[in-house]
């Protein structure tokens, strides 16, 4: 048996924040390193989306003609220009682990995950007020949105209309590490 050197785990290396987001922090007068320290201390991270109206052309199962409600910003597929869906909020859901069947006094072993609207008290404390439902962030006129979320927690999200009805529901779960500022272009 020979010992072989294993490559370092890339997920353990520090993530870098994209230059465009670094510029936004600088313009707002926020020291990015101090902000990331604050996030780490509170076991939080930031998820930012540059343009929620932009979708993957290969996704034909979800609505893809999206327009920011009350604004002209939209992304329309010229081959299929209708219908157009107005979106107003991005709503995050967190995976809560619940005990299996059996009741409170005699629970059976095991846990199951269930999606619940974001309710982590620390994350909710530091997010700005929203006009949307629980766990929502307003979509800005340029199509961008950002939210402080709990780190080390499985998260998913959906885009909702002005009545908080889900329009685009993501079918994947992600998690972040404390202090991370993660950006998605669409």
PLM regions: where:
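Extended surface/linker regions that mediate inter-domain or inter-protein docking
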Residues: 1-186
């Amino acid at each position: 048996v020979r010992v072989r050197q294993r490559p370092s785990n890339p997920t353990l290396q520090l993530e870098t924040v994209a230059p465009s987001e670094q510029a936004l922090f600088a313009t707002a007068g926020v020291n990015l390193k101090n902000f990331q320290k604050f996030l780490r201390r509170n076991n939080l991270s930031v998820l930012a989306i540059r343009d929620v109206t932009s979708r993957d052309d290969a996704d034909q199962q979800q609505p893809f003609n999206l327009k920011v409600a009350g604004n002209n910003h939209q992304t329309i597929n010229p081959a299929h220009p209708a219908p157009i869906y107005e979106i107003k909020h991005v709503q995050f859901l967190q995976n809560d682990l619940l005990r299996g069947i059996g009741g409170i006094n005699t629970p059976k072993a095991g846990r199951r995950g269930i999606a619940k609207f974001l309710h982590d008290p620390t994350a909710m404390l530091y997010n700005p007020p929203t006009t949307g439902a629980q766990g929502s962030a307003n979509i800005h006129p340029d199509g961008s949105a950002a939210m402080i979320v709990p780190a080390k927690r499985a998260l998913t999200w959906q885009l909702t209309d002005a009545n908080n009805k889900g329009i685009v529901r993501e079918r994947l779960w992600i998690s972040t590490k404390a202090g991370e500022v993660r950006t998605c272009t669409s």
